[in-house]
């Protein structure tokens, strides 16, 4: 499964949005309707799924689906 699809799966489950709404450029708050708690829970789910640690300082910079993908790719490199 491609990284985007794995990330998308977590986002759809955590934010309860339709899969077609999850695009690389989609912003979690503005486009997907997430609030700050939703974002925190989503970050925690992503950390668990990909076995990575996303520090708070980095989590604050993650605004879009692509930001998550970029971070995971760097963390796994």
UniProtKB/Swiss-Prot annotation:
Q: Which residues carry this modification: O-(pantetheine 4'-phosphoryl)serine?
A: 36
**PTM annotation, UniProt:** 4'-phosphopantetheine is transferred from CoA to a specific serine of apo-ACP by AcpS. This modification is essential for activity because fatty acids are bound in thioester linkage to the sulfhydryl of the prosthetic group.
As for family, the record states: Belongs to the acyl carrier protein (ACP) family.
Task: Tell me which stretches of the chain form a coiled coil.
Answer: none
The record's GO CC annotations read: cytosol; membrane
The record's subcellular location field reads:
Cytoplasm
> What phylogenetic lineage does the species belong to?
Bacteria, Pseudomonadati, Campylobacterota, Epsilonproteobacteria, Nautiliales
| PROSITE patterns registered for this protein in UniProt | CARRIER (PS50075), PHOSPHOPANTETHEINE (PS00012)
Record-annotated Carrier domain positions: 1-76
Tell me which UniProt keywords the record has, alphabetically. Answer: Cytoplasm, Fatty acid biosynthesis, Fatty acid metabolism, Lipid biosynthesis, Lipid metabolism, Phosphopantetheine, Phosphoprotein
Chain's role: Carrier of the growing fatty acid chain in fatty acid biosynthesis.
Q: Name one GO biological process term.
A: lipid A biosynthetic process
Q: Which organism is it from?
A: Nautilia profundicola (strain ATCC BAA-1463 / DSM 18972 / AmH)
Q: Which SUPFAM superfamilies does the protein's record reference?
A: ACP-like
Pathway the protein contributes to: Lipid metabolism; fatty acid biosynthesis
Q: What is this protein called?
A: Acyl carrier protein
Show the GO MF annotations: acyl binding; acyl carrier activity
């Amino acid at each position: 499964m491609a990284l985007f699809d794995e990330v998308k799966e977590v986002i759809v489950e955590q934010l309860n949005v339709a899969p077609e709404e999850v695009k690389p450029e989609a912003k979690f708050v503005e486009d997907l309707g997430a609030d700050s708690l939703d974002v925190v829970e989503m970050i925690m789910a992503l950390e668990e799924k990909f076995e990575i640690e996303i520090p708070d300082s980095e989590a604050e910079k993650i605004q879009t689906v692509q930001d998550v993908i970029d971070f995971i790719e760097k963390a796994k490199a």
